[in-house]
Design a protein with these regions (language model features):
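Charged, low-complexity intrinsically disordered terminal segments
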Residues: 1-529
Length: 529
């Protein structure tokens, strides 16, 4: 296996204006499954920072009062106390749509002001396409005097309400409003990646490119500009400290940072035509798949994305697609619900038509039977290539919003049979296989130490095992829940097909508002990313 077989080359990245490396070697990547694990680790790392260290972060939503541990501190307390110790705290939070539209305008502003009052600088950033968002979830911690301790976190977990859940999936005691089908404290499944080594420098560069971009923070929003002027908001980022050298190599993982930036006017200085390495990176990896693609995704929308999977399934008769998605959208209502449903129904239908016996889609519930909201954005291909990020499998994430993902290739082979799933000589890799197995052990109620992994290694056996467990749990529910609950938390996912009258308006609303296209016109016409 060569890294170029899986990772994008500089030419394939197609963004020469960015200073981001093509990929980095010698890293150590660790998946942190669930918000409780991530928040606990983040508290430990931030509390160890001292004067002159760097704390940079980007976020889609930030709730200042979200408790990082059961007894605190809150997000605002953790970052404000760091600033008070002399840590250089800088943040970019999306300037959200109005709270009246079920977004987080006021929460993001409150977090910004709380950290600013302590000596940090957190800016509300609206340098996106109209109707778009900054969806990256990143924290970079640099210690210029001790670079070996530098660490960064990237993935799907925001610093906000509803995220501090664990494997028990009782939900976060501080919930956000969601569909009532998820209960008063919605169970939440998510993944964040902790990385050390030279990739921390690449993620630092990602933050710095956005921070130093000369485009106005409230671009194309005169109302936001007026409100900011009246409130005395910080609209001009202060200079950042000099970027430290990359941390030294520390592990066997090659990491490629993948991003989405839309084509906008004025242009991003670091991505004049936008950047779509998320879409290109997934496309390259999926086209190399031969036996198993495993996804966890919040949406799994878009016919353009589904066509990629459908083509792979058509070309490779031994390939299986296994996906774990939410049972219900996070919203309810006569107007909001149908556009959320129609995109997934279209995408899954396209995949099923390509290979009806080899597409396996599940949703998750906790042991009380409450559905778990799947917010994770994870992809594992043939137990070789794996990614964790902020991006969903839809056109919005691949073209329209800002997104950030880390793809990982491990030098360390996993010698358990089958040692080479695809037969291409790549060989199963420890990081990718362990990530898939950790997730499946939880979903199937298997031994977390791996003692019950034997039927989860070979793709055909694994698909049979996961399907049998989901069907058995389904039968238990259908039978009135009589007798002991079978092990496992997965149920077969059955998307509801909307009536044709509803589809008439839901489909255009979905394509124009919920899943828009941020590509330049020439890329749209060519059907390329």
């Amino acid at each position: 296996m060569t890294l170029r077989d899986w990772f994008l080359t500089a030419q394939e990245r197609a963004n020469p204006r960015s200073e981001l490396p093509v990929w980095t070697d010698g890293n150590l990547a660790e998946p942190l499954i669930h918000g409780a694990a991530y928040f606990d680790r983040l508290v430990s790392e931030v509390e160890s920072l001292t004067a002159g260290d760097h704390l940079f972060f980007t976020d889609w939503r930030g709730d200042p009062d979200e408790r990082m541990r059961p007894d605190g501190p809150t997000v605002a307390q953790l970052f404000a106390q760091a600033a008070q110790r002399g840590v250089i705290v800088k943040g970019l939070i999306w300037r959200s749509h109005l709270d009246t539209l079920s977004y987080s305008e006021e929460e993001n502003r409150d977090l910004s002001e709380a950290i600013r009052a302590a000596g940090g600088e957190v800016l509300l950033d609206q340098r996106v396409r109209r109707g778009g968002s900054h969806h990256q979830k990143l924290v970079v911690l640099r210690r210029p005097g001790e670079p070996r301790r530098d660490v960064a976190f990237a993935g799907g977990i925001d610093l906000c309400h509803s995220r501090r859940d664990d494997a028990g999936h009782a939900g976060d005691p501080q919930p956000i409003g969601m569909s009532p089908r998820y209960g008063p404290t919605p169970p939440w499944h998510d993944v964040q990646l902790a990385v050390r080594g030279p990739v921390v420098g690449a993620l630092d560069t990602t933050f710095r490119e956005r921070w130093t971009d000369p485009m106005p923070l409230d671009s194309e929003n005169p109302m936001a500009y007026l409100r900011d002027r009246l409130r005395g908001s910080d609209l001009r980022p202060d200079p950042l400290p000099e970027q430290p050298a990359d941390p030294p190599p520390c592990g066997p993982h090659h990491v490629q940072v993948l991003r989405t930036y839309p084509a906008v006017r004025p242009r991003y200085s670091f991505a004049p035509d936008g950047e779509r390495t998320v879409a290109r990176g997934y496309t390259k990896a999926v086209r190399r798949a031969r036996r198993l693609i495993y996804l966890e995704d919040q949406y799994l929308w878009s016919t353009e994305v589904a066509e990629l999977f459908a083509q792979a399934l058509h070309e490779h008769p031994d390939l299986h697609l296994v996906a774990v998605v939410p049972r219900h959208p996070d919203v309810d209502g006569r107007l909001a619900l149908p556009p959320n449903m129609v995109g997934r129904e279209q995408a899954l239908s396209l995949c099923h038509r390509a290979a009806p016996e080899r597409v396996h889609v599940f949703d998750v519930e906790n042991h009380d039977g409450t559905p778990v909201y799947v917010h994770a954005k994870v992809c594992v291909v043939d137990d070789v290539w794996a990614s964790v990020g902020s991006d969903n499998f839809n056109r919005r994430s691949w073209t329209h919003d800002s997104e950030l993902s880390c793809a990982v290739l491990d030098d360390t082979r996993d010698e358990r049979a089958p040692a080479d799933l695809a037969g291409l000589g790549d060989g199963a890799r420890v990081f990718a296989r362990d990530l898939r197995l950790r997730l499946w052990r939880e979903h199937l109620d298997r031994d977390p130490g791996g003692a019950q992994d034997d039927d989860l290694l070979d793709p055909a056996d694994a698909v049979a095992a996961i399907t049998a467990a989901a069907e058995e749990l389904d039968r238990w529910h259908a039978g009135g829940r009589a007798g002991p609950r079978p092990p496992g938390r997965l149920r077969p996912h059955r998307p509801e097909r909307l009536p044709w009258r509803t589809r008439l308006w839901a489909l255009p609303a979905y394509r124009l508002v919920y899943d828009p296209d941020g590509r330049p016109l020439r890329a749209r016409r060519a059907g390329t990313w």
